[in-house]
UniProtKB/Swiss-Prot annotation:
InterPro entries: ARM-like, ARM-type_fold, Arm_3, Armadillo, Importin-a_IBB, Importin-a_IBB_sf, Importin_alpha
Region (Disordered): 1-41
Gene behind the chain: kpna5
Official protein name in the record: Importin subunit alpha-6
Origin species: Danio rerio (Zebrafish)
Pfam families, per the entry: Arm (PF00514), Arm_3 (PF16186), IBB (PF01749)
Amino acid sequence: MDAMASPGKDNYRMKSYKNKALNPQEMRRRREEEGIQLRKQKREEQLFKRRNVSLPPGDESMLECPIQDPDVSSTVPVSGEGVITQDVIQMIFSEDPDQQLIATQKFRKLLSKEPNPPIDEVIGTPGVVNRFVEFLRRSDNCTLQFEAAWALTNIASGTFQHTKVVIETGAVPIFIELLNSEYEDVQEQAVWALGNIAGDNAECRDYVLNCGILPSLQQLLAKSNRLTTTRNAVWALSNLCRGKNPPPDFAKVSPCLSVLSRLLFSSDPDVLADACWALSYLSDGPNDKIQTVIDSGVCRRLVELLMHSDYKVVSPALRAVGNIVTGDDIQTQVILNCSALPCLLHLLSSPKESIKKEACWTVSNITAGNRAQIQAVIDSNVFPVLIEILQKAEFRTRKEAAWAITNATSGGTPEQIRYLVSLNTIKPMCDLLTVMDSKIVQVALNGLENILRLGEQESKQNGTGINPYCALIEEAYGLDKIEFLQSHENQEIYQKAFDLIEHYFGVEEEDASIVPQVDQNQGQYIFQQSEGPMEGFQL
């Protein structure tokens, strides 16, 4: 996900660039919503394994209920294209339990075909999906329950229309009942189906929540001793917590925080990863939600998991920690008190670019805090690494590092800003002035303005009248770049560029081709568009 702020927040922040310090609440950047999407890759990886693997050796029996797997290939005729035959349809509607089982297994195997299971063909066969749902109620025949649940799971792994068919047949309340089945295979298949359904979109997620899944799901997670069941259950739980347009009813999902806090101590990376994903979703919101997550006691363990050896755990743990520090200063301090900064320093050197970017984003929200928090970042030796990232990393990561540095110049003390200058931060900030991303040009201009403002104060205090940072910016070719920005298509950028030159880089003889005219009617500057560098900007 992109970690940039919402347009509203950014616009407000940029409009107040002449203030001595940016509002810390505005400097904090929540995650921009990209729409509710399934973790499709995760879900498809699981289903890929299920569709391609028959019942594993040694797993062909359930507690007091042996799985029956007749040789359906010799019993049921199928055409070369796998078309459903009348014989199979007759068998599934038979009153003979053996015939029902053979036919259901046949459908399940069809639905387990890769890469394109014939889901449309199955749901287009009148009465078949309803028949599967009927079989879910057959508590006297757990094998039939299991096979029907498996078939419905694979139907629900398809498109929204496929999932909708399963919902409309009334399967969800029955699946929730089956979470309390005495047979673990049935429990596991039921929770897998519910995870597929809840993961489709917000409408499906909320329907499953409104059917009352959470108590049974929490109970399953509390008592299950089977790792695969726990994995599927926590994955389903993460799908129930997922989404922002709209988010799930927090009152319905927040009770799962207690079980999630326990799952964070699992030794299984898959369980840890999905528990962290769930917490990242729950913490992605306003401060009251963040506080509820903090109050559940998960922060210290989340910070510990930043050092996990498996990236699939580190990534969601970092996402959750990053979301928590978008809160207020007190909430941010909870994370800092868990010794997060040494962990973040480690992640800033990660070979995985997405981890590095998220770590920069997290630090940027810490440097949007108070001066003591900025000092904590300084004391952890994070800034030298950020400045190196600003020079060498991929652009999306450089953007986050720029936010971190500009936020520190906005809220920092004079001594803290001088420290940043001593690390040679001016040159890489000047280099950002020619990028195509207008928002980052504004961020860089803000950071440089904060440094220049300090220099002006120093020049008045020491009586020299010379701003020491003007020369550093000129040496970094920053003045040339700021002059070019006077022809930028973005009004806020060209006004800021003009203001900086006028205020800090006044020249004896003004060049009429550079100084903008003023449109008296519109109350804004007018610039010659042709003066912009042809390759530097979109004009």
